[in-house]
C-alpha cells in the first residue's frame, strides 16, 4: 500500500512539473507581453484538437512560453501554423 501511495504521489508531482514548462495557447492580446520568436507548422492531424496538440508540442520543443495559432485547414488531414513567443 505504501509503495502504491508513493508511486501515485510521484506521478502527480511529475505531471505538475511538466505542465509548468509547457507552451500555453495565447490570444493576440496576451502576446504583447512576450516577443515573437518564429513560427511552427504541423500536418497530418485528424482533427483540430490533434492539430493544436501537435502545434503545442512543436512550440514546447522550441522553448516557447506561448503560441498563437494563425491558420488551420484541411479535410482528412489537418494542417496549420502558429507564431511562437518567448
Swiss-Prot record:
Highest taxon, organism lineage: Bacteria
A Pfam short name: YdgH_BhsA-like
A GO BP annotation: response to stress
Coiled-coil features, chain-numbered ranges: none
Leader sequence residues: 1-22
CC terms in the record's Gene Ontology section: periplasmic space
Induction data: Repressed by McbR.
Keywords: Periplasm, Signal
SUPFAM superfamilies: YdgH-like
InterPro entries tied to this protein: BhsA/McbA_stress_biofilm_assoc, Dodecin-like, YdgH-like_sf, YdgH/BhsA/McbA-like_dom
Subcellular location: Periplasm
Main location: periplasm
Function noted in UniProt: Affects biofilm formation and mucoidy.
Family affiliation: Belongs to the BhsA/McbA family.
Protein name per Swiss-Prot or TrEMBL: Uncharacterized protein McbA
Record organism: Escherichia coli (strain K12)
Lineage, uppermost ranks: Bacteria, Pseudomonadati, Pseudomonadota, Gammaproteobacteria, Enterobacterales
Gene: mcbA
Amino acid at each position: 500500500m505504501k509503495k502504491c501511495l508513493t508511486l501515485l504521489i510521484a506521478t502527480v508531482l511529475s505531471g505538475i512539473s511538466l505542465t509548468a514548462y509547457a507552451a500555453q495557447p495565447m490570444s493576440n492580446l496576451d502576446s504583447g507581453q512576450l516577443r515573437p520568436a518564429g513560427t511552427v507548422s504541423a500536418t497530418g492531424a485528424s482533427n483540430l484538437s490533434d492539430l493544436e496538440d501537435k502545434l503545442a508540442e512543436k512550440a514546447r520543443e522550441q522553448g516557447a512560453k506561448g503560441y498563437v495559432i494563425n491558420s488551420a485547414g484541411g479535410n482528412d488531414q489537418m494542417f496549420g501554423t502558429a507564431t511562437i513567443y518567448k
